[in-house]
């Protein structure tokens, strides 16, 4: 009986740790070091990583990946976050966020940490990407394996089924 209780307790403890780890960002903004880029591209829009340690040329990002444009002040962006977190945790899709129009970098960092955003994020404090992405947020771009935009989803994803369908169709 004691052995069964011990095994059951251990299983519950381990399953709880796994779930928490998947949502945790350890109180830090995710690094951009693993964003894959095409080094032959050197002209375009350079954005700093939200962690402040590097920058990425937007036009050099390789796919397949989702580029999700968001702002901490954007209620619809917050609404779709659980769907994006679930898709990212599944390991079936890479996501890169672009935080736009924040009053300051710290606002974006604080939001990313509090919201459990564990994928890399770039920042666009001046809104210079609006000409490429459009005026509103959220907007999600789908880049195929060649880094070519295959689809632009404007607005929030209404369900995980919708997001999964678009991932399968456009990546």
What label would you give each PLM region?
Residues 63-64, 92-94, 118-119:
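Loop/turn elements at helix/coil->beta-strand transitions in domains of secreted/extracellular proteins
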Residues 78-115, 125-131:
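Structural microenvironment flanking redox-active thiols in thiol-disulfide oxidoreductases
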Residues 66-67, 95, 140:
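Hydrophobic beta-strand anchors of alpha/beta hydrolase catalytic cores
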Residues 113-117, 123-171:
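Thiol/disulfide oxidoreductase modules built on the thioredoxin-like
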Residues 63-65, 70-73, 136:
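Short pre-active-site segment immediately N-terminal to redox-active cysteine/selenocysteine motifs
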Residues 44-65:
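A short beta-strand-turn-helix
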Residues 1-48, 162-165, 171:
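N-terminal targeting signals for export/organelle localization
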């Amino acid at each position: 009986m004691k052995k069964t209780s011990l095994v059951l307790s251990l299983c519950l403890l381990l399953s709880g740790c796994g779930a928490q780890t998947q949502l945790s960002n350890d109180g830090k903004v995710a690094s951009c070091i693993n964003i894959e880029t095409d080094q032959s591209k050197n002209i375009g829009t350079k954005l700093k990583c939200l962690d402040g340690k590097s920058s990425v040329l937007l036009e050099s990002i390789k796919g397949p990946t989702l580029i999700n444009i968001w702002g901490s002040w954007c209620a619809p962006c917050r609404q779709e976050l659980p769907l994006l977190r679930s898709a990212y945790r599944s390991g079936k899709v890479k996501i890169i966020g672009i935080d736009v129009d924040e009053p300051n970098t710290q606002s974006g960092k604080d939001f990313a940490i509090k919201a459990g955003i564990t994928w890399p994020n770039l920042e666009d404090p001046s809104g210079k990407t609006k000409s490429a992405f459009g005026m509103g947020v959220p907007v999600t771009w789908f880049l195929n394996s060649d880094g070519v935009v295959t689809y632009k989803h404007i607005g929030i994803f209404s369900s995980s089924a919708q997001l999964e369908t678009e991932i399968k169709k456009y990546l």
